[in-house]
Design a protein with these regions (language model features):
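Active-site-adjacent structural elements that line small-molecule/cofactor binding pockets in enzymes
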Residues: 1-298
């Protein structure tokens, strides 16, 4: 199992410094979200041009605000800047964001993703797109000098989205999904669908908060506050319920080095191919202890 790290909320200079340190520490990958801050692909274009080894990934870019051709052009540009080290993770986001903030319809999200992929997949493969659907059309090709085909992952939690990910992409990327749910739901559903579609082995990239600490109880209280929104968003709530977790703090990997190591190993045993650590800390000793454990696992 490969080990990556996740970062959000930094300036561009801080992101470059973080990526440089992650590469020096031996991490396999660096993942950046597209939320309400830096443009993830623009930021990774800069990182990819400056940091020579790390795989760079988005976890994830919402589909609705951008036409597939615009997203593909950004991804191919980041690919060109990084020598082909970009993996594009995309997702539906959430109804409260898409309708309440962006003003788009969230009707039939699986249909939306299926049509989006019909346009996006060929463009990421450096092939022309020729698709007309109910919600979007794409009849064009892109030419980005130096770009290589970009692997694609879909943030898939429910069965229909997992089946779609298996049929059309390289796999899935998950957040706030625990090892029991991965082992009993996510990985088997994805694998079965890939076997039926003949698409081969699937990649399962899974992220969770991680902290090595002597104050497990105190840091779990802190995690409950920091990550509380994920306990209310329906798609993540469904995964927490499958896991038997009362909230995000229950799936976070928090505690002694031995306990956190065992938690990461459970993710591997569940079928995760890439574990992404969201390094969660409140002080320097926790940050140092967490990073040291992760380095031991690389």
């Amino acid at each position: 199992m490969r080990i990556g790290t996740f970062v959000d909320g930094l300036t561009l200079d801080e992101l470059l410094a973080f990526a440089t340190k992650a590469e020096a520490d031996g991490f396999d990958s660096l993942w950046v979200p597209q939320i309400f801050g830096l443009d993830a692909l623009a930021a990774l274009t800069l990182v990819g041009h400056s940091v020579p080894r790390l795989e760079l990934g988005t976890a994830v870019v919402p589909t609705y605000p951008r036409h597939p051709s615009a997203l593909a052009a950004s991804a191919l540009t980041a690919s060109a800047a990084s020598g082909g080290r970009l993996t594009l993770g995309i997702g539906l986001s959430h109804q409260i964001v898409i309708e309440g903030m962006f003003g788009y319809s969230y009707d039939k999200p699986v249909r939306h993703m299926r049509e989006y992929l019909e346009a996006l997949v060929p463009l990421l493969s450096l092939e022309p797109a020729d698709f007309t659907g109910e919600t979007l059309s794409a009849k064009l090709e892109l030419s980005v000098p130096g770009a290589k085909p970009v692997p694609l992952l879909v943030a898939a939690l429910g069965p229909k989205m997992l089946e779609l990910a298996a049929e059309r992409t390289s796999g899935t990327v998950t957040w706030m999904t625990g090892p029991q749910t991965l082992a009993e739901h996510t990985v088997p559903t994805l694998t079965k669908a890939a076997e039926a579609a003949g698409t081969g082995d699937m990649r399962v990239v899974s992220a969770l908060p991680v902290a090595v600490t002597d104050d497990e109880a105190g840091l779990r209280v802190r995690a409950a506050k920091v990550f509380q929104v994920y306990g209310f968003l329906p798609s993540y709530r469904a995964m927490l319920d499958r896991e038997g977790a009362s909230g995000p703090e229950d799936v976070a990997l928090i505690g002694s080095a031995a306990k956190v190591r065992a938690g990461i190993e459970r993710m591997r045993d569940a079928g995760v191919t890439d574990f992404v650590a969201v390094e969660f800390h409140t002080d320097e000793p926790v940050a140092t202890a967490t990073r040291e454990l992760l380095k031991e696992l690389l």
